[in-house]
């Protein structure tokens, strides 16, 4: 069945998942539903501690069994040890048919691929995957489906009861023996625990895992003792050098600097750039450079930002230090400066639900003026792909891309015209993750395209000295350099589903097959 972005979703996938096809961003606007809730154990007669000896003991006490869904967060990013530790123990216990529901999975989790191959893990729900897990899914080694959701979409799936987490494992930099969790204060600081908050709220059992046990009470708690069943102390929950990567450095790449300058000039010439505007940007080189150059213009024109949102890096936190922004709203910290900034009284942690959930009564993304994003591919319909590489292998994550693009008044995607020898601007993206109706502007090193849906922006920019082109012109320039690329060759089997943030199906990912050259 064709959906609103022209993708044909197989009937068997609709039947298997019980889903509808994507009908557009506002299809569920005004929808009412009753939220799901977890099983909760009353603790009245307590010995005053929830400490258990090991992850094994926690699994036993939680009643681990075949077919369960286990929840994880990714605040430790490429330094995470939690997923591998837990799944190693699950594997030793002979448990099978596990669904992993993670906020994201990366190269740090390559070690679980054998557990995918032997059936310990049969389904994955995540924002996306990188590394060997993506390769395993794309080559058909996962027996079930990989369902990719945005950060807001994961919260929606959990709170509606579509996904029921049996046991959530929350890695926490500090914790007391009664389960009060904080993202700061230990040797593995990650700043905030925003993605894990929904796990704490809705999982039937919650296990806090820490490498820094502190005296009770560990307040103010980011995740409360009232949500936690057991606490495990281990030697290390992650590699601090890979959790936060130091100060995010401005790029010296001239192409990225050019795109950053285009982006800044577009922002400051738009109708939304005025005192009290709001802003979110990413962690890429061009995005960081655009934030730095924007700060200079803000200072020159005496314009203040009301709030910044993130995924935060040093340049955004510098705005707070320099009194150029009233406050920061934080869901994830990408460098040490952002982790340290959490201590600032105007640096507020927010949950993933507050940030981007489309099924609550209004999330932060709906208040954004600007969001600056990246993409692997953008097509002539302004659809974006941020999950599947040019070789057809799953190699990225939706993150907050669809959420912020849908919510912001002006969503800007920065992408080089060519990724190596592969056109990033193309006729049709390999896989749609963010629909073109959400994307307002595409900035490349060869020019800027404004979505024809946004005639107001086109009118506002008519006298601005920037290299504007149509998206088709950008595609044609790319193809004139590289030629039109051969389409990725997929098999018939669907191995992954790309969910829209509202839970409808945006696209599917099929198993790849070896490339075959067409005969003349």
Residues of each region from the PLM?
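Conserved alpha/beta enzyme-core scaffold
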Residues: 1-520
């Amino acid at each position: 069945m064709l959906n609103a972005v022209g993708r044909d979703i197989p009937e068997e996938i609709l039947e298997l998942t019980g889903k509808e096809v994507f009908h557009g961003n506002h299809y569920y606007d005004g929808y009412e539903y009753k939220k799901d809730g977890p099983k909760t154990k009353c603790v009245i007669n307590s010995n005053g501690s929830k400490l258990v000896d090991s992850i094994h003991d926690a699994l036993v006490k939680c009643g681990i069994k075949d077919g369960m869904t286990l929840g994880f967060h990714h605040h430790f990013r490429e330094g995470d040890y939690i997923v591998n530790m837990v799944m190693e123990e699950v594997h030793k216990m002979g448990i099978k048919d596990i669904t992993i529901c993670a906020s994201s999975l990366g190269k740090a989790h390559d070690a679980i691929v054998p557990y995918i191959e032997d059936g310990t893990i049969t389904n994955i729900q995540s924002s996306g995957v990188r590394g060997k897990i993506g390769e395993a899914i794309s080559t058909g080694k996962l027996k079930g489906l990989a369902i990719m959701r945005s950060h807001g979409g994961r919260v929606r799936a959990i709170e509606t009861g579509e996904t029921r987490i049996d046991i959530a494992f929350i890695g926490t930099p500090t914790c007391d023996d009664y389960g009060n969790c904080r993202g700061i204060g230990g040797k593995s600081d990650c700043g905030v625990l925003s993605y894990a908050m929904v796990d704490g709220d809705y999982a039937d059992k919650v296990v806090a895992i820490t490498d820094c046990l502190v005296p009770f009470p560990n307040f103010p708690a980011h995740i409360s003792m009232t949500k936690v069943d057991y606490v495990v102390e281990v030697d290390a929950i992650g590699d601090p050098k890979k959790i936060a990567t130091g100060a995010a450095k401005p790029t010296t790449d001239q192409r990225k600097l050019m795109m950053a300058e285009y982006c800044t000039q577009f922002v400051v010439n738009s109708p939304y750039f005025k005192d009290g505007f709001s802003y979110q940007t990413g962690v890429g080189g061009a995005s960081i450079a655009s934030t730095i150059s924007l700060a200079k213009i803000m200072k020159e024109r005496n314009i203040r930002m009301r709030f910044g949102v993130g995924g935060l890096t040093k340049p955004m936190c510098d705005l707070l230090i320099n009194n150029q922004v009233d406050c920061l709203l934080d869901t994830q910290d990408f460098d040490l400066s952002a982790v340290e900034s959490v201590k600032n009284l105007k640096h507020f942690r927010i949950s993933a639900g507050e940030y981007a959930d489309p099924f609550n009564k209004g999330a932060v993304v709906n208040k954004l003026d600007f969001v600056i994003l990246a993409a692997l591919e953008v097509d002539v319909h302004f659809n974006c792909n941020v999950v599947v590489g040019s070789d057809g292998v799953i190699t990225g994550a939706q993150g907050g891309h669809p959420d912020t693009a849908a919510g912001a008044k002006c969503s800007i995607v920065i992408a080089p015209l060519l990724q190596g020898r592969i056109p990033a601007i193309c006729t049709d993206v390999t896989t749609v993750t963010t629909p073109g109706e959400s994307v307002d502007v595409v900035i490349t090193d060869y020019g800027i395209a404004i979505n024809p849906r946004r005639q107001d922006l086109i009118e506002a920019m008519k006298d601005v000295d920037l290299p504007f082109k149509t998206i088709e012109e950008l595609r044609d320039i790319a193809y004139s350099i590289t030629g039109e690329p051969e389409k990725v060759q997929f098999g018939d089997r669907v191995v992954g589903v790309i969910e829209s943030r509202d839970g409808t199906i945006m696209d599917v990912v099929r198993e790849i097959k070896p490339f075959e050259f067409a005969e003349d």
